[in-house]
């Protein structure tokens, strides 16, 4: 990823620096593609979340890459693993990897949220940038529409037809909104599809990314996530509790 973005890699190790750990790191690096820019390693003892968050600020990190468990159990969901805590507190964008590999696996399909939000344009722009740098030719923008917008109780053929018409109008509305965003983004040579889904935000796009076997899911960072959002999940919490694939959270 660093080579594709022509970026510097900064490794953060929380714990004591030893000769063995340095040797282990060099062994790992020797098994990967050579870096265009030399790696900088930060060795610091302390509480992992605090050390990493401070490093993000001090080193002016643009993207924090973390390994993450694919599915958290109930205890970890409420207590929060290191990766989840960093996701909520870091000031930069975050890439959560659930299937890291020494040998690069081609990225063939990126799914990105297209919900109506001030952050969405930047998120779509970032997904296109990643698509170009990862040489991915397929991007799907998912517009999640709440079922509450239908406001129709389907109990006969007439109400079913009415619901179908309303769904189509909502879909056209969302498609047009996303098309307006795409007018200002250079997406040449990328196949971009729009997909409207009616359902719960976060859960719906996560399920879609899973069944479509997307290689990367790109999401807006939540505006505010407190304890109530973790008890009554915010849309991003559905994604964090059971990662469907690698996830990029754009801040």
Regions inferred by a protein language model and the residue ranges of each:
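Structural beta-alpha unit
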Residues: 17-20, 29-64, 183-217, 222-227
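Short, surface-exposed alpha-helical segments at coil->helix boundaries
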Residues: 18-29, 171-179
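Short glycine/serine/threonine/alanine-rich loop segments
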Residues: 6-7, 37, 61, 92, ...
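Well-ordered alpha-helical segments embedded in enzymatic catalytic cores
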Residues: 51, 123-126, 177, 204
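Gly/Ser-rich helix-loop-strand patches that form or flank binding pockets
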Residues: 53-103, 207-251
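Small/aliphatic-rich secondary-structure junction motif
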Residues: 1-21, 32, 109-163, 182-188, ...
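A short acidic, glycine-rich active-site loop
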Residues: 161-173
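General small-molecule cofactor/ligand-binding pocket signal
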Residues: 10-12, 40-44, 95, 140-142, ...
């Amino acid at each position: 990823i660093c080579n594709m973005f022509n970026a510097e890699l900064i490794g953060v190790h929380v714990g004591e620096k030893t000769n063995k750990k340095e040797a282990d790191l060099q062994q790992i690096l020797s098994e990967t593609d050579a870096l265009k820019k030399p790696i900088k390693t930060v060795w610091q003892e302390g509480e992992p979340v605090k050390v990493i968050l401070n490093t993000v600020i001090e080193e002016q990190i643009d993207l924090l890459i973390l390994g993450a468990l694919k599915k958290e159990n109930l205890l970890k969901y409420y207590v929060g693993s290191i990766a989840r805590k960093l996701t909520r507190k870091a000031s930069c964008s975050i890439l959560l990897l659930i299937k890291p590999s020494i040998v690069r696996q081609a990225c063939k399909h990126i799914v990105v949220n297209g919900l109506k939000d001030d952050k969405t344009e930047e998120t779509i722009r970032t997904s296109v940038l990643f698509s170009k740098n990862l040489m991915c030719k397929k991007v799907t923008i998912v517009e999640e529409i709440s079922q509450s917008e239908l406001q129709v109780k389907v109990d006969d053929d007439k109400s079913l037809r009415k619901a179908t018409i309303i769904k189509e109008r909502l879909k056209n509305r969302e498609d047009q909104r996303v098309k307006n965003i795409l007018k200002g983004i250079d997406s040449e040579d990328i196949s971009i599809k729009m997909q409207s889904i009616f359902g719960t935000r976060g859960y719906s796009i996560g399920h879609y990314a899973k069944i479509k076997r997307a290689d990367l899911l790109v999401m807006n960072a939540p505006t505010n996530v407190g304890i109530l959002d973790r008890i009554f999940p915010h849309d991003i919490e559905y994604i964090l509790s059971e990662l469907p694939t690698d996830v990029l959270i754009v801040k």
